[in-house]
Amino acid sequence: MAIRPILPYPHAGLSGICAPVTVFDDHLRELVTDLIDTMRAAPGVGITAAHIGVLQRVFVLELTPGTILTYINPEITSHSPQTMRHVEGSVSMPGFTDEVERPSTVEVRFQDITGAEQTETAEGFHAICIQHEIDQLDGIFWLKRLSRLKRDRLVKKWEKSRNP
């Protein structure tokens, strides 16, 4: 329906903790549609409601073109002891990426757009994306998963790119 403005890092809205969704109605469907449109325009493979200034526990992923995955009130219920490293970034900090280490498999409980409870086991890149977006719903920007040295270097480059 609409491409919404994305909050740029380090906007305070990105560190807010998102509230659970309690009403599954047309407003929620409109939010999800706006998230999809905004994510595709960014472009990105995932986006949370927090990225557009809405502090609700909603995110969408598009890992395969044309296949949208919607997660409402997601919660990781278990994860593997095995980890993997993968390059991560954010629509709030376009063009800046680094490797982050996370569990390679997760089980997630969530609700779909109708409010129905779902569970899913995700592996590899899919698992990484779920963890990344749930972190954002909890106010944890992906940079916090880096060492202080890497984080400081990226933030300096980001600030310089915004204020040449």
Swiss-Prot record:
Active-site annotation: E133
Domain of life (superkingdom): Bacteria
GO molecular function, one term: peptide deformylase activity
CDD domains noted in UniProt: Pep_deformylase (cd00487)
Name of a matching Pfam family: Pep_deformylase
GO biological process terms, semicolon-separated: co-translational protein modification; translation
Family: Belongs to the polypeptide deformylase family.
Family matches, as NCBIfam families: pept_deformyl, PRK12846.1-5
PANTHER family (UniProt xref): PEPTIDE DEFORMYLASE (PTHR10458:SF22)
Identification of the protein by name: Peptide deformylase-like
Origin organism lineage: Bacteria, Pseudomonadati, Pseudomonadota, Alphaproteobacteria, Hyphomicrobiales
